[in-house]
Amino acid sequence: MYLTEQIMDRPKPRTVKELADTLVIPLIDLLIPCKFCNRFLSYFELLNFDHKCLQLIWTEEDLVYGLCSSCAYASAQLEFTHFFQFAVVGKDIETVEGTAIGNICIRCRYCFKLLDLVEKLATCYKFEQFYKVRNSWKGLCRHCGSVE
């Protein structure tokens, strides 16, 4: 069995690191196009892709796509503008969801990074808002919160 056949028989990699490991090549040598603009992700964007806990997009033809920083920001803005539902202040998100904040999936409203517990608690501590957008929760990550 050829290496490509072995790769195709496995579940498709979800992260940039998994893809590099599967192909047995250095991460820096990966060429992954953005799903929206088709520009190849830079090395920094490849690292950030996994840091943000995003997942690779696979087509039926076994083509793989990622999401560049520019398109992530543009997509997040479009989504927030057109699909905003409501906002809650800090810890009120637990009441709305009926579970502890650590169990709630919240992504950054600007870059789509999955927020960690410290980022979620910082939002609560500062009495800032979480936003329900397209049936998902959004907040601010450390980086975007420091830029805003």
From Swiss-Prot:
Its primary localisation, in coarse terms, equals host cell
Q: Which domain of life is it from?
A: Viruses
InterPro entries recorded for this chain?
Answer: E6, E6_sf
Stored Pfam families? E6 (PF00518)
Q: Where in the cell is it found?
A: Host cytoplasm; Host nucleus
The stretches annotated as zinc fingers (unnamed) lie at 34-71, 108-144
Q: Does the keyword Hydrolase apply?
A: no
Q: Which UniProt keywords apply?
A: Activator, DNA-binding, Early protein, Host cytoplasm, Host nucleus, Host-virus interaction, Inhibition of host innate immune response by virus, Metal-binding, Modulation of host cell apoptosis by virus, Transcription, Transcription regulation, Viral immunoevasion, Zinc, Zinc-finger
- Gene Ontology CC: host cell cytoplasm; host cell nucleus
What Gene Ontology molecular-function terms does this entry list?
Answer: DNA binding; zinc ion binding
The membrane spanning regions, by residue number, are none
A Gene Ontology BP annotation from the UniProt entry: symbiont-mediated perturbation of host apoptosis
Q: Which family does it belong to?
A: Belongs to the papillomaviridae E6 protein family.
Could you tell me what this protein does?
Plays a major role in the induction and maintenance of cellular transformation. E6 associates with host UBE3A/E6-AP ubiquitin-protein ligase and modulates its activity. Protects host keratinocytes from apoptosis by mediating the degradation of host BAK1. May also inhibit host immune response.
The record's note on quaternary structure and interaction partners says: Forms homodimers. Interacts with ubiquitin-protein ligase UBE3A/E6-AP; this interaction stimulates UBE3A ubiquitin activity. Interacts with host BAK1.
- UniProt protein name: Protein E6
